[in-house]
Amino acid sequence: MARIPLLLALLLAVSAAAAAQVGGNRGHGPLVGGWSPITDVGDPHIQELGGWAVERHASLSSDGLRFRRVTSGEQQVVSGMNYRLVVSASDPAGATASYVAVVYEQSWTNTRQLTSFKPAAAH
């Protein structure tokens, strides 16, 4: 008879632990697979990623875009990190526009890929 309350207590403890895993990540770092805002876009690494993305795009498209700065962004934890960066860039005539660059980076393998680069309006 004492087994039933013990089993119920165990079941309740397991359920509470599972619920904490599902909803307990609020405010405790990025959720794996979910996008979270980059709080400090002025961070030198974020600015360097934005510059690299514009340079990579310009080398592939020959449109002459020049990096100005990262204005906002999000990050996504995957097997490495995806960065969705809103960058300000200017064309050869000096006109400035915003673009959305998605960069995949895996620091332990020195991997960096530009997976997307579009005008911000198309984002």
UniProtKB/Swiss-Prot annotation:
SUPFAM superfamilies: Cystatin/monellin (SSF54403). It holds the Pfam family SQAPI. A motif (Secondary area of contact) lies at residues 76-80. The record marks 33 as: Reactive site. GO terms for molecular function: cysteine-type endopeptidase inhibitor activity. Residues 1-19 form the signal peptide. It is found in: Secreted. One of its GO terms (cellular component) is extracellular region. It comes from the Eukaryota. GO terms for biological process: defense response. Residues 33-91 form the Cystatin domain. InterPro entries: Cystatin (IPR027214), Cystatin_dom (IPR000010), Cystatin_sf (IPR046350), Prot_inh_cystat_CS (IPR018073). Keywords: Plant defense, Protease inhibitor, Secreted, Signal, Thiol protease inhibitor. Belongs to the cystatin family. Phytocystatin subfamily. Specific inhibitor of cysteine proteinases. Probably involved in the regulation of endogenous processes and in defense against pests and pathogens. PANTHER family: PHLOEM FILAMENT PROTEIN (PTHR47116). This is Cysteine proteinase inhibitor 8. It comes from Oryza sativa subsp. japonica (Rice). The lineage of its organism: Eukaryota, Viridiplantae, Streptophyta, Embryophyta, Tracheophyta.
